[in-house]
C-alpha cells in the first residue's frame, strides 16, 4: 500500500476516533461541552486531512523528509492533551458543585454581614405569616441598569403574598449587588464566576432545602415581563384531565397569544433546529425550547438540584430534551417578553455560534445517554 493511502487511512481513523470518543465522554458526563466542541472540531480537521488530496499530500511530504518522529510526538501530545481535558472537565464539574455548596453554607452561616442584617429584619416582619410555597429565582451578572426595574415590579403585594424572591449574584463588577441590597424583601446569594447554569442550580438547591413547592426562574435583564408570573404559577398548580399537574411550564415567545419578540436570523435557525430535533426524538412539538422563563414543580427542580443532572453552562434545549425523555410532564404557555434595551447579553458577539455548537453536541448526547446507555 502506498504511503499516501496509509496516511489518509490513519488520519481518517484518528478523526473518527476523536469525534466518537468526545461524543461518548460528553454523553456519560466525563467531558464538558466546551472541550467536546474543541475535540470535535479537531476530529473534523483530521478527517479533512485524510479526505482532501492536497492536505494528505502535505502530510506525506513530512513523512518523506524523515519527520516521522515529529508526527509521533505530535500524536502523543494530542493523546495526553485529551487525557488532560478529561481530567480538567472532571475537576471543573466537581468545582462547580463544591462552589455551590460553599455559597449555600456561607449564606446559611451568615458570613455576609449585609445579608445577615437583611435576613433578621425580613424574618422579624414575616414570622407570623404562613410559609410561602413559591420561590422566584433571578441569576444576576452585571445588570445594574435593569435589575432595579425588575425588582421594583416583583416587590409588589400581589407577588410577595405568594412568593419569595432569590437573587444569585454571580460576581457582578458593577452596582448590581448594591441595588439588590436596597430591597430587604429579596434574598441574595453571592457566587463567583460559576455561570448561568450553576446559578440556577444553586437556586434549585435553595428551594429544596427550604421546602418550596414551586420555582419560577426568570432573567434579570427585563426581557421577562413580571406579568407572566401569576399565569405560570396558576399553570403549575392546575391539573390536567388525568389529575396530574405539570412538572415544567415553559413560557413561550412563539405561541399564539405571545407578544411579538424580535429574533435574529441565527437565533431563528437555532430555534428551528432544536424544535426539529426534539420533535424527531420525542414526538412533542415545543414552540420555544430555549426560553429562560420557566416554572418548575418540586419533582423537576429536585431532580435538577442533584449532582450532574443539570447543565451548568447553558441549560436550554438539552434540558428540555432530557426531561421529556425522562417522562416529566411539560407544557407551554404564551408569554409577554421584551427585547433587551440596556446592558450586554451573554449571547452577544460570537457567543450564539459557540452556543449552537455546544447545543448541537449536547442535545444528541442527552438522547444517547438516556435512550441507549440507561437501557443497559
Question: Language-model segments: which ranges?
Answer:
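Donor nucleotide-sugar binding loop of glycosyltransferases
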Residues: 143-146, 172, 225
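N-terminal signal-anchor/start-transfer transmembrane helix
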Residues: 11-28
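Hydrophobic helical membrane-anchoring modules
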Residues: 34, 48-80, 84-90, 94-134, ...
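A conserved acidic beta->alpha catalytic loop
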Residues: 169-177, 222
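Short, well-formed alpha-helical segments that are part of the catalytic scaffolds
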Residues: 143-157
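Hydrophobic transmembrane alpha-helical segments in integral membrane proteins
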Residues: 1-15
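Short beta-strand/loop segment that forms part of the nucleotide-sugar
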Residues: 138, 162-172
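Acceptor/aglycone-binding surface of glycosyltransferases and processive sugar-polymer synthases
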Residues: 190-209, 214-216, 226-313, 340-350, ...
Amino acid at each position: 500500500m502506498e504511503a499516501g493511502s496509509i496516511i489518509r487511512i490513519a488520519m481518517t481513523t484518528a478523526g473518527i476516533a476523536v469525534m466518537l470518543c468526545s461524543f461518548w465522554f460528553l454523553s456519560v458526563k466525563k467531558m464538558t461541552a466546551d472541550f467536546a466542541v474543541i475535540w470535535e472540531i479537531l476530529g473534523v480537521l483530521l478527517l479533512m486531512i485524510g479526505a482532501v488530496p492536497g492536505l494528505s499530500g502535505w502530510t506525506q511530504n513530512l513523512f518523506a523528509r524523515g519527520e516521522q518522529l515529529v508526527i509521533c510526538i505530535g500524536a502523543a501530545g494530542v493523546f495526553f492533551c485529551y487525557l488532560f481535558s478529561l481530567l480538567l472537565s472532571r475537576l471543573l464539574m466537581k468545582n462547580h458543585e463544591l462552589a455551590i455548596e460553599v455559597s449555600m453554607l456561607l449564606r446559611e452561616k451568615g458570613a455576609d454581614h449585609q445579608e445577615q442584617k437583611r435576613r433578621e429584619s425580613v424574618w422579624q416582619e414575616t414570622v407570623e405569616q404562613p410559609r410561602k410555597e413559591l420561590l422566584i429565582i433571578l441569576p444576576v451578572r452585571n445588570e445594574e441598569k435593569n435589575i432595579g426595574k425588575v425588582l421594583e415590579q416583583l416587590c409588589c403585594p400581589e407577588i410577595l403574598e405568594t412568593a419569595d424572591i432569590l437573587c444569585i449574584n454571580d460576581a457582578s463588577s458593577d452596582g448590581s449587588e448594591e441595588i439588590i441590597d436596597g430591597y430587604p424583601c429579596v434574598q441574595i446569594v453571592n457566587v463567583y464566576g460559576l455561570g448561568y447554569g450553576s446559578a440556577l442550580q444553586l437556586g434549585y438547591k435553595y428551594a429544596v432545602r427550604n421546602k418550596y413547592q414551586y420555582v419560577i426562574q426568570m432573567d434579570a435583564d427585563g426581557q421577562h415581563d413580571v406579568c407572566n408570573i401569576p399565569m405560570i404559577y396558576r399553570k403549575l398548580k392546575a391539573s390536567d384531565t388525568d389529575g396530574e399537574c405539570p412538572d415544567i411550564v415553559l413560557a413561550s415567545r412563539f405561541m399564539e397569544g405571545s407578544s411579538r419578540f424580535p429574533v435574529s436570523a441565527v437565533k431563528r435557525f437555532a430555534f428551528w433546529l432544536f424544535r426539529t430535533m426534539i420533535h424527531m426524538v420525542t414526538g412533542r412539538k415545543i414552540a420555544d425550547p430555549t426560553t429562560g422563563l420557566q416554572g418548575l414543580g418540586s419533582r423537576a427542580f429536585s431532580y435538577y438540584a442533584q449532582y450532574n443532572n443539570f447543565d451548568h453552562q447553558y441549560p436550554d434545549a438539552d434540558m428540555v430534551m432530557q426531561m421529556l425523555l425522562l417522562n416529566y410532564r411539560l407544557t407551554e404557555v404564551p408569554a409577554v417578553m421584551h427585547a433587551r434595551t440596556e446592558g450586554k447579553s451573554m449571547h452577544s458577539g460570537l457567543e450564539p455560534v459557540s452556543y449552537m455548537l455546544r447545543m448541537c453536541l449536547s442535545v444528541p448526547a442527552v438522547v444517547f445517554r438516556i435512550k441507549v446507555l440507561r437501557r443497559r
